[in-house]
Amino acid sequence: MKKVSGPEDRMREKIIAAIRRIPHGKVSTYGAIARAAGFPGAARRVAWLLHRSYGLPWQRVVGSGGEIKLRGDSAIEQRLRLEAEGVTFRGRRVNMKRHEFKFAKKSAGSIRTRQSGRAKRVR
């Protein structure tokens, strides 16, 4: 993978990493992914990156409330892929109570160290 250098590269890599954390059989929203990556309000950037591909599990990303935002054949393909993963729907929306992936919340008082990866309390 390319070495991350500027702010745009860091943003892209963090968003891609968040998308890749969504497990088989779970979904997340564009906004939740942006927040998990540390960029609240960047939901459109998430959509743009999915469009660029990067070999991401694009089918696991839905709109708020579980709505498939794609249209036409792409929407049909997304639903079929999700159903193949065991994801259930309520009408046109993913059953978010069952299938929403919750990203771990970062504690405001902790940081990750580069060497150990463990969280340390900051006072």
Annotated model-derived regions:
Residues 2-123:
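Nucleic acid-binding interface residues in structured DNA/RNA-binding domains
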